[in-house]
């Protein structure tokens, strides 16, 4: 029997390991068997990077607000743009107003394609699942929780600075409350990846099988 596509958000603060967890879940044969189908992953940030490079109207609107982010060739300086956004809440809010509608449409397109191919579970990775409006289009969400010290160590280990971590972490201070507000299931990500995969898989199985017989 064909089962409907289930769309679940995967959120968490910076350096919480969202992408690593998503990749492990996509590769988990045990999860596929438990929910009765394939698992795929879409990253909102990746979709946004594509949109910034291909959507001229979006790029022009962004540059109107942050003109110093324009490179000599007319493209966006993403690093400078991110620095401005994390340093100035007004810039962050304006960017989100411009970008999230584009991301929601892109994820809707990905979702339709996945459903047409018979995918069982689509993991939607995004930090701002609540205020982006994405949560309203999902069947549930997971909140990956990792101690701040661990996240800082991970961020620095992959080449970031401690100061940059503090700026980005502070800018995301409201994320946990937003995720709680949309009913996200908390997942402890402070342990090993296999432990986190197990906990997330259990939660995903419950979300996928809601309203269905588990016999």
Model-predicted segments: where are they?
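Hydrophobic anchor at the beta1->P-loop junction of P-loop NTPases
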Residues: 10
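ATP-dependent NMP and nucleoside kinases share a basic, alpha-helical "lid"
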Residues: 108-116, 121-157
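ATP-dependent small-molecule kinase phosphotransfer cores
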Residues: 46-119
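Small-molecule kinase domains that catalyze NTP-dependent phosphoryl transfer to phosphate-bearing small molecules
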Residues: 107, 131-137, 156-215
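P-loop (Walker A) phosphate-binding loop of NTP-binding proteins
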Residues: 13
């Amino acid at each position: 029997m064909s089962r409907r596509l289930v769309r679940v958000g995967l959120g968490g603060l910076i350096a919480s390991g969202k992408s690593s967890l998503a990749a492990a879940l996509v590769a988990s044969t045990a999860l596929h068997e438990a929910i009765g189908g394939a698992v795929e992953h879409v990253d909102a940030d990746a979709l946004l990077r594509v949109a910034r490079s291909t959507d001229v109207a979006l790029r022009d609107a962004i540059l109107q607000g942050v003109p110093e982010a324009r490179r000599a060739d007319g493209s966006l300086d993403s690093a400078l743009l991110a620095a401005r956004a994390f340093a100035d809440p007004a810039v962050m809010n304006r960017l989100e107003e411009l970008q999230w509608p584009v991301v929601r449409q892109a994820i809707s397109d990905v979702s339709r394609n996945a459903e047409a191919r018979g995918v069982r579970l689509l993991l939607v990775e995004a930090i701002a699942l609540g205020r982006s409006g994405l949560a309203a289009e999902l069947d549930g969400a997971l909140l990956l929780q990792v101690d701040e010290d661990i996240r800082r160590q991970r961020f620095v280990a992959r080449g970031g600075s401690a100061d940059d971590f503090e700026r980005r972490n502070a800018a995301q201070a409201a994320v946990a409350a937003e995720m709680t507000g949309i009913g996200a299931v908390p997942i402890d990500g402070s342990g090993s990846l296999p432990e986190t995969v197990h906990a997330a898989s259990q939660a995903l199985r419950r979300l996928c099988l809601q309203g269905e017989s588990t016999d």
